[in-house]
UniProtKB/Swiss-Prot annotation:
Enzyme class: isomerase
Protein's UniProt name: Ribose-5-phosphate isomerase A
Function description: Catalyzes the reversible conversion of ribose-5-phosphate to ribulose 5-phosphate.
Domain of life (superkingdom): Bacteria
Gene name per UniProt: rpiA
Length: 232
């Protein structure tokens, strides 16, 4: 699948997901290439159809995009609930376990998700896998002592790599932390790994989102299809 085909599937999933946002809602808006299409469609509906809703974003770049359409964006602490959060995912399996954080927004994404009544992910079909872990698992760590955390990960066989930008500088999250990507190839026991990571001093959050999502909208060549989590 080339990039144009992949983008077409992402766009279709984003347009389908935008239908979930209705007048008067408070909607969490995620981060990433698929969410960009979602925000474009919500912006179109706001400007052309008069859709009025309040957004809570998981990154500053999504906030800038949404506000460019005139969408009202507020801080998460200025709302008492979030009706639905729509976000992308880097991988998702049949048990609705996912990896997120390829865009370095995993902490804000998880905070918004855990305060939402409903969580929806939008992905293209390449992101649906049998076992998560092929995509590197992002872990957000504070800069102080990050090298020590990386050494611990190396000792555990996690194959950590500090994420750098095109200029060779450390990628910084919106909270000014570092991102360490774990090249695990496959994750057979995600819950155990999640507990190990979050209990490591210096780790702020990890990109494992386990059985959190209610619905996954998959961009498919035959049209968007919906995976519904029966355990939620």
């Amino acid at each position: 699948m080339d990039k144009a085909q992949q983008d077409a599937l992402k766009k279709a999933a984003g347009i389908e997901a935008a239908k979930l946002v209705e007048n008067g809602m408070i909607a969490g808006l995620g981060t990433g290439s698929t969410v960009k299409f979602l925000v474009d469609e919500l912006g179109r509906r706001h400007q052309e159809e008069g859709l009025e809703f309040t957004g809570v974003t998981t990154s500053r770049r999504t906030q800038v995009q949404a506000e460019s359409y005139g969408i009202k964006i507020v801080d998460i602490d200025d709302v008492d609930h979030i009706d639905v959060t729509i976000d992308g995912a880097d991988e998702v399996d049949k048990n609705f376990n996912g990896i997120k954080g390829g865009g370095a927004a995993l902490l804000w994404e998880k905070i918004v998700a855990t305060n939402s009544n409903q969580i929806v992910w939008i992905v293209d079909e390449s992101k649906v896998v049998d076992t998560i872990g092929k995509f590197p698992l992002p872990v957000e760590v504070i800069p102080f002592g990050a090298g020590q955390v990386i050494k611990k990960f190396e000792a555990r066989g996690y194959k950590p790599v500090l994420r750098l930008d095109a200029d060779g500088k450390e990628v910084r999250t919106d909270e000014n932390n570092f991102v360490v990507d774990l090249h695990l190839e496959r994750i057979d026991h995600p819950q155990e790994l999640a507990e190990d990571l979050i209990n490591t001093v210096g780790v702020v959050e990890h990109g494992l989102f386990l059985n959190m999502v209610d619905k996954v909208i998959v961009g498919d060549p035959n049209g968007p299809r919906v995976m519904t989590n029966a355990n939620k």
